[in-house]
Amino acid sequence: RMGFPFVTTAHWVFDTSGILRYLTNWGQRTVAVSEDIKEYLIREYGLPPEHISVTINGIDTEKFSPAVSGELVIREFGLDTSRPILSYVSRMDADRALVARQLIQIAPELDRAIPGIQLLIAGGGNVFDELKALANQTNQRLGRNCITMTGPRTDINEIVAAGDLFVGVSRAALEAMSAAKPVIVAGNEGYHGLFGPDKLTEAQAGNFCCRGLPVSRPETLLADVSAAFSLTWEERERLGAYGRQVIFDHYSVRRMASDCLTMYEQVRRRKYRVVMSGYYGFSNAGDDAILESIQQAIHEASDEVAVTVLSNDPDLTRRQYGLDAIPRFRMWRV
């Protein structure tokens, strides 16, 4: 319709109230980054399931690697590597910074439970100034620089590497896993806790965004951070190594690129364009079987052929066969 192939990528869920859903065009195909986003697109926008491909957030395992020392960040902010360091990365916006606020809130209790702990909180946004003021007040009460608010950064791999434990959600959590850090997965949409083998399936279902999980609470966060730092060095190493292997197995950049290329291939312009006319879209088993057979034969013969079906029910034909279809009596569309 627009004269060019159009593929979108869905990374989040959006407000669909009023006329908003009708103002959105998801293109000929959509790449979703998780199964729950795919279900959301089907439910809220009525997209055909066969037009949605699920991929992953691909992580650069060389950039986010145990080989990155974090030394530059440690020197910049005067962190003490002989004391525990917790790193956190997120946008400091009202709808994203709940866990950052909770970390600042529980800092005095963390200091009692884990003497000398340092919180390295990175990110900028519309509540950054407010949170920085709270952090400064907490530091004054503790009589030391317990909380470091870095503001917006581009060297996130260095921020992650500087910490012994990472707290965060979504892509930031995956990047920390790639760096072989133990990770507490927590964000505005929910709380997952210290990631390990027992939590993989649930975490993957929501793309590590915690959608549908219990809300993050300061007391739960305090307990899990304390428990994580009470683990032996070997136990934390094992958790970090497991997280990095999960990235290699399920979240590689190569996998993400392959998924996108496959979807782009589905919509690229073909050299030959074929229009099929018949008794299609009437839910007639015999004619539908013929259509399926012809379509399969064309596909096997050449990937340079684009097929458009003249159908009594174009939506039904698209859903059943993934083929482009137009109303059979609107000849000007041909």
Regions found by a protein language model. Give the residues of each.
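A conserved, positively charged/aromatic
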Residues: F4-E35, G46, V160
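Acidic anion/phosphate-binding donor-loop and adjacent secondary structure
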Residues: I19, I42-R43, I59-E76, A94-L98
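Carbohydrate-associated surface elements
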Residues: D36, G58
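Conserved donor-binding/catalytic core segment of Leloir-type glycosyltransferases
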Residues: V73, L79-A100, I104-P108, L120, ...
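Nucleotide-activated donor-binding/catalytic signature segment of Leloir-type glycosyltransferases, i.e.
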Residues: L131-R153
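Acidic donor-binding loop of glycosyltransferase active sites
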Residues: E158-L174, A180-I184, E189
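A short, well-ordered alpha-helix in the C-terminal region of glycosyltransferases
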Residues: A227, E234-H250
